[in-house]
């Protein structure tokens, strides 16, 4: 079942509030405004009947006002088994979804290159300390969608001591059929000699 949590205005406010706090901490710069998340606001799902009735909790992408660090702590405190599937690096870094060439998450996030004015006690440092407390002594299972991402998770100070497994994203060949490339190009009226990248 899919349940809707929060109304349109509440959902929008939580999203905007998180972006506002990032913008404020970034001294009114839009730089990387949507490439970082701080999980400072979100919904409390532990009070829903679906959460209470669940045998296991499986988290996926929880950012941009969906769950806060304190809300995740409530989930962890429930005593229910937790599986968290990583779709980016946010679980193993402080605030970024992709660290690029930065490897601070292997020790401690600070002086964040995603911020306009990085320094030793910047926003990344404060969120890292909160996440460090959040993940301490919590027996969660981390699922990575790739070996590459699992390798990064295993090198992260935050979650390297967690059970980490790789379960790749898959496509059902019953739903997605592979057709001949040339025939598809002709049917879709696509150029036959051009290199084409499609995504959705």
Question: Where are the predicted features?
Answer:
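A conserved catalytic-core segment of Leloir-type glycosyltransferases
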Residues: 1-56
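N-terminal subdomain of nucleotide-sugar transferases
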Residues: 1-4, 52, 77-81, 162
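Short aromatic-enriched loop/helix-cap "lid" or pocket-rim segments at secondary-structure transitions
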Residues: 2-9, 15-16, 71, 94-99, ...
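Short N-terminal targeting/anchoring amphipathic segment
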Residues: 46-66, 81-87
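Catalytic-core regions built around general acid/base machinery
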Residues: 70-79, 130-134
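Donor nucleotide-sugar binding/catalytic pocket of nucleotide-sugar-dependent glycosyltransferases
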Residues: 91, 104-181, 187-190
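Conserved donor-binding/catalytic core segment of Leloir-type glycosyltransferases
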Residues: 143, 191-200
